[in-house]
Regions:
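A polyanion-binding, active-site-adjacent surface
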Residues: 1-110, 114-131, 135, 139-151
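Charged phosphate-binding loop/patch that engages nucleotide di/tri-phosphates or the phosphate backbone
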Residues: 137-180, 190, 194
Length: 198
């Protein structure tokens, strides 16, 4: 029996920026793209056939253990993606990319359905991302990415109730994503004058 072909015209992948030696005109054409293709169970040509874009068009250098990222430029490019792309499913590679699309404080492997599209917040594939150090993370990421790309719904595993140790004025919503990591979304703006710990 022949396996159904993946619908690359319905899939988009959005990354932060090209690598130091990467070609700005070919998003995900290097090692990170190969890693995504391997995790997705796609051959490299299928990955390249999907819509692809970097939110920062050039490598910006390092900052600490990660990379510099221009959020203002990224947010403009994210708006362009929403306006221009006619795809059903978009994989956001990294939390910086997710923030540019307005998704803050959500865990990796969370799926969001909004704007008539589905988004998957996927860990940045770079080797500097320590999230990949745990085998169970990679196994779960592979499972969920493949399901998402084939159009299946990614299961969300948010608990029905969880005791909070916060005061009522610090109400927040806590949940567990499909990979078991926790996210907290606060409903209260932090005070400009909050005490800092010594």
């Amino acid at each position: 029996m022949k396996q159904k072909k993946i619908e690359t015209d319905k899939i988009g992948l959005v990354g932060q920026a090209p690598s130091r030696r990467g070609d700005p005109c070919k998003p995900l054409a290097g090692p990170n793209g190969q890693k995504i293709a391997r995790l997705a169970g796609l051959n490299y040509d299928e990955l390249i056939a999907c819509r692809r874009k970097h939110l920062n068009t050039h490598y910006s250098g390092k900052r600490g253990k990660g990379y510099r990222f221009d959020h203002a430029k990224g947010s403009v490019k994210a708006a362009d993606v929403l306006l221009d792309w006619r795809v059903e499913r978009i994989v956001l590679l990294g939390k910086n990319v997710a923030r540019c699309f307005g998704f803050r404080d959500l865990p990796f492997l969370a799926e969001i359905s909004i704007y008539g599209r589905r988004f998957l917040i996927f860990p940045h594939p770079s080797s500097t991302n320590r999230w990949w150090n745990e085998r169970r993370n990679e196994r779960r990421a592979r499972q969920l990415l493949q399901r998402f790309l084939w159009g299946e719904t990614v299961p969300a595993e948010f608990p029905k109730s969880r005791r909070s140790t916060r005061t009522p004025s610090q109400t927040s919503s806590t949940g567990t994503s499909a990979n078991g990591s926790r996210a907290t979304i606060s409903r209260r703006k932090p005070s400009r004058f909050s005490r800092r710990s010594p």
